[in-house]
Every structure is written in structure tokens, then in C-alpha cells.
Design a protein with these regions (language model features):
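Short hydrophobic/aromatic beta-strand or adjacent loop that forms the aromatic wall/cage
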Residues: 10, 112-116
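Conserved active-site alpha-helix within GNAT-family acetyltransferase domains
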Residues: 20, 57, 69, 81-100
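Residues forming the Rossmann-fold NAD(P)(H) cofactor-binding site
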Residues: 53, 57, 61
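Conserved GNAT acetyl-CoA-binding A-motif
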Residues: 60, 67-79
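Aromatic/hydrophobic pocket-lining residues that form π-stacking "cages" and hydrophobic walls in ligand
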Residues: 1, 63, 86
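Conserved catalytic-core motifs of GNAT/GCN5-like acyltransferases
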Residues: 26-29, 34, 76-79, 91, ...
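Acetyl-CoA-dependent GNAT
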Residues: 1-49, 60, 120-121
Length: 121
């Protein structure tokens, strides 16, 4: 996946602490069709011990800047409705809730709603 994203001109960033990975952030097109060529969807993952230190904000700033320079117009975050911290994190960065998809994903043995948040870059 890393090589594919980089070959497509997307960022794939890995954060390290004490020589080990503690977070990653990447993005790709929201949808494959040309009408969505300027709308991206990102993924950000931090280990629990790396949270609350500003690392997530730094990773997001870096991928948003990369996407903006590459011509992206907006960034989408898809967050499980149960992930209140993830939703709050994105809202604090200027993302607005634009949709909720009921029972869109299955995790931990149950169906979960998916929140869609968007930021115009």
C-alpha cells in the first residue's frame, strides 16, 4: 500500500518514538471516478501512548498540506460513531459532520454507524 500511495503522489507518513513506529497518516482519493479527483479520504492511527502529545495534529497538518499542494479541494474523515475521541479530534481540526451511515461497518462482532466529516482545504 505504501508504494502504491506514493506512486500516486499521495503522502504516507510514519511517526516514530524511541525508534519504533507510534503513528501513521495517509490519504487517497475518496472515490475512483474523475468527478471526485479532488476529494481525498485520510487514515490516521496513533498508538495509545502517543495520543495527547500533538503528534496527531502534526501528522494531520502534514497530510493536509501535502494534499492541498497536490491539488486536493477537500479531505474526508470516516470515523466510527462510537469513536468519540476521533470525532472530537477531527472537529477540533475544523472538520464538519456531513453524514452518518447507519450499520455501515462491522467491528468487534457488531454493526457500527460511520460518521463522515469533511474539511475544505
Amino acid at each position: 500500500m505504501i508504494a502504491e500511495r506514493q506512486a500516486a503522489g499521495r503522502a504516507f507518513l510514519v511517526a516514530e518514538a524511541a525508534g519504533r513506529p507510534v503513528g501513521l497518516a495517509t490519504y487517497d482519493r475518496f472515490r475512483a471516478s474523475n468527478g471526485y479527483a479532488h476529494t481525498m479520504e485520510h487514515t490516521i492511527i496513533l498508538s495509545p501512548d502517543a495520543q495527547g502529545r500533538g503528534l496527531g495534529r502534526a501528522l494531520m497538518a502534514a497530510i493536509e498540506d501535502h494534499a492541498r499542494r497536490a491539488g486536493a479541494h477537500s479531505m474526508i474523515a470516516a470515523v466510527s460513531a462510537e469513536n468519540r475521541a476521533g470525532e472530537a479530534f477531527h472537529r477540533a481540526l475544523g472538520y464538519a459532520l456531513v453524514g452518518r451511515l447507519p450499520d455501515a461497518g462491522r467491528k468487534f462482532g457488531r454493526w457500527m454507524d460511520l460518521l463522515l466529516l469533511q474539511k475544505i482545504l
